[in-house]
Amino acid sequence: MSSLLQGVNLYLIGMMGAGKTTVGHLLAQELGYGFLDTDNVIAQAAKKSINEIFAEAGEAGFRQIESDVLAQVCSYTKLTVATGGGIVLRRENWSYLHHGLIVWLDVSVDILYARLAADTTRPLLQDDDPKGKLRSLLEQRTPLYSQADLRICVNAEETPEQIANKIMQVIPSVLKQTTAN
C-alpha cells in the first residue's frame, strides 16, 4: 500500500470527535508513516491548550495559526495527519490539503454528541445547547467536507481498527481515479 501511495500524505478531516486522531495513529502504523495531529502541534508550539489559544486569539487567530501549521506540514511526505474539525473553513487550507489524499470521517451528530458530551476541552462546544451547536457546525461544514477524495461513513458499532481497515481497502480505487484524470 505505501508503495502505491508513493509517500503521499493522508489528511483526515471531519468533525471534532470523529476519531481522526485514533484512526490516524492506526493508519500511520499500517503504512509505516509518521503521525501528526495539527491541534497537538499547535498546542505544543504555543505552549498553551487549544482552549487558551481560542480565549486569547479568538477563533480567527486560531484558524490563522492552524493554516500556518498546515502549510509547514504539507512540505513533508509519508505522514498521516489528523486535522482540526474547522480546518476546511479556510480556502487556503484546501490548497495545502490537496498535496495529499483527503479522507473525510463522516460521523452523525448523535454519535459525535455521545462521544463529546463529557469533554470540556472543546471551545466551540461551550454552549447552552452543545448538541444543537454540533448539528449547526456539521450542517455548515458538510459541503466543505464533501470535497474530500474519500468519504468514510462511520457507524456507532465500528471500532477504530475497522474504520482504518475500511480506509485501507478503498485507497487503491481512489488513487486509480486520481491518476486516470
Swiss-Prot record:
Q: Which residues bind substrate?
A: 39, 63, 85, 141
Q: Which cofactor does it need?
A: Mg(2+)
Principal EC category: transferase
Where does the UniProt entry say this protein principally localizes? cytoplasm
Q: Which GO terms describe its biological process?
A: amino acid biosynthetic process; aromatic amino acid family biosynthetic process; chorismate biosynthetic process
Q: Amino-acid biosynthesis as a keyword?
A: yes
Database matches in SUPFAM superfamilies? P-loop containing nucleoside triphosphate hydrolases (SSF52540)
Q: Which keywords belong to this entry?
A: Amino-acid biosynthesis, Aromatic amino acid biosynthesis, ATP-binding, Cytoplasm, Kinase, Magnesium, Metal-binding, Nucleotide-binding, Transferase
- Biological or metabolic pathway of the protein: Metabolic intermediate biosynthesis; chorismate biosynthesis; chorismate from D-erythrose 4-phosphate and phosphoenolpyruvate: step 5/7
Q: Which Gene3D superfamilies match?
A: P-loop containing nucleotide triphosphate hydrolases (3.40.50.300)
Q: Where in the cell is it found?
A: Cytoplasm
Q: How is the cofactor bound?
A: Binds 1 Mg(2+) ion per subunit.
Catalysis: reaction(s):
shikimate + ATP = 3-phosphoshikimate + ADP + H(+)
Question: EC annotation?
Answer: 2.7.1.71
* One GO cellular component term: cytosol
**What does the entry list as the binding residues for ATP?**
17-22, 122
Q: Which GO terms describe its molecular function?
A: ATP binding; magnesium ion binding; shikimate kinase activity
Q: Where does Mg(2+) bind?
A: 21
The task this protein performs is described as: Catalyzes the specific phosphorylation of the 3-hydroxyl group of shikimic acid using ATP as a cosubstrate.
Task: Return the similarity comment.
Answer: Belongs to the shikimate kinase family.
Protein name from the UniProt record: Shikimate kinase
